[in-house]
UniProtKB/Swiss-Prot annotation:
<dbReference type="Pfam" id="PF07642">
    <property type="entry name" value="BBP2"/>
</dbReference>
<protein>
    <recommendedName>
        <fullName>Uncharacterized protein aq_113</fullName>
    </recommendedName>
</protein>
<feature type="signal peptide">
    <location>
        <begin position="1"/>
        <end position="17"/>
    </location>
</feature>
<keyword id="KW-0732">Signal</keyword>
<dbReference type="InterPro" id="IPR011486">
    <property type="entry name" value="BBP2"/>
</dbReference>
């Protein structure tokens, strides 16, 4: 649910000398959004322990966006706070973090999540600049919007949040075609990177196809498909990645691929909506280290029963399991990890 802060900010005061009025007004609606969530995580084979557990705040995000103008439009989107960004690899034992634009990395604590300004000089064209969220992948930075509590193994190897500039051409505004193209330059990991892609819809099928180039590091082609049939949401995320010559060693595999399948049946009841998101993944990184480092091949299975008594509240439980060919857990002595989680959340 989105909340609008209507034109408000009225302030008047009298100067002692001149008795002048001071008047301040925001002329356009501001959209306020965000969410807060917390949970409990129990995981096996973490660091040198058989098991670990933590109570965690998983999201505390406050966002504000606005757009002004008529023929030429200006806008911004700013979100601050922190998120846990737990994965099937760490089992929710990581740190509550934010994005540091100076160091260009995630850091423990509260701060910027993303924030950018944009210009729409003419219909269908947009220039965005600032700290952006990626167009790559199925899973989103605000984790309460994802079907699962933890991020998957495929997401773990994808771009995320970074400073950059993005150009978008939206044909739905120009010719009533549900297709948009984008090109961007960014500095994720303090590299000079670029990406191009196409997003759109074909009937009930949504799609996104992107190419992303980490300079002197790696490249990836990413495909995301979405489809709804009856009361079931279906999603597919496939990506193929390969190392640049300067980033690989002699005898090392130079490519990897991963695929994630999402099946999300939903059921309406008189008490609210119940859903049962399922995520199944497989990846093959060989000795490239692209997906995790040393895992070789692996698969994950995640099930997240979710109940929403209202559109902006939820409670969900989760069981996730990851298995790898090589032993990469518990200091290299185990080849699997199981995570149990329970999360409560409120969004607005």
């Amino acid at each position: 649910m989105k909340k609008y802060v209507l034109p408000l900010l009225f302030l008047s005061s009298l100067s002692l000398a001149e008795e002048k009025s001071l008047y301040l007004k925001v002329s356009q609606p501001l959209e306020l959004y965000g969410g807060i969530s917390a949970g409990y995580f129990y995981t096996t084979n973490e660091d040198g322990k058989d098991s670990s557990d933590k109570l965690q705040i998983t999201n505390a995000i406050l966002g504000l966006k606005a757009e002004v103008g008529e023929k030429i439009r200006f806008g911004f989107d700013l979100a601050v706070g922190g998120s846990l960004w737990s994965t099937v690899w760490d089992g929710g034992q990581g740190d509550f973090s934010y994005y540091d634009p100076d160091e260009k990395e995630l850091k423990e604590g509260v701060g910027l999540h993303w924030g950018y300004a944009y210009l729409k000089p003419f219909k269908g064209f947009e220039v965005s600049a600032g700290v952006l969220t990626t167009n790559i992948g199925y899973e989103l930075a605000d984790t309460y919007s994802n079907p699962n509590v933890t991020f998957g193994a495929v997401w773990y190897a994808q771009p995320f949040i970074y400073p950059g500039v993005r150009l978008t051409l939206d044909f739905s505004e120009i010719a009533d075609l549900p297709v948009s193209l984008y090109a961007e330059y960014n500095q994720e990991y303090d590299l000079d990177n670029y990406a191009v892609g196409i997003l759109g819809e074909l009937g009930n099928l949504s799609y996104a196809l992107s190419y992303y180039d980490y300079r002197a590091s790696k490249n990836l082609v990413d495909l995301v498909l979405g489809y709804t049939i009856f009361n079931v949401d279906l999603g597919l995320n496939f990506d193929y990645q390969w190392l640049d010559d300067s980033a690989k060693s002699a005898g090392q595999d130079d490519s990897a691929y991963g695929v994630a399948l999402y099946v999300i049946p939903k059921f309406e009841t008189k008490y609210g909506e119940f859903s049962l998101p399922l995520r199944l993944e497989y990846f093959d990184e060989g000795s490239s280290g692209i997906y995790f480092g040393g895992a070789d091949k692996g698969y994950t299975l995640t099930v997240t029963p979710t109940f929403r008594p209202t559109p902006n509240t939820y409670v969900r439980a989760e069981v996730s399991y990851v298995n790898t060919d090589n032993k990469v857990f518990k200091n290299g002595t185990k080849d699997n990890k199981t995570t149990l989680a329970v999360e409560l959340g409120f969004t607005f």
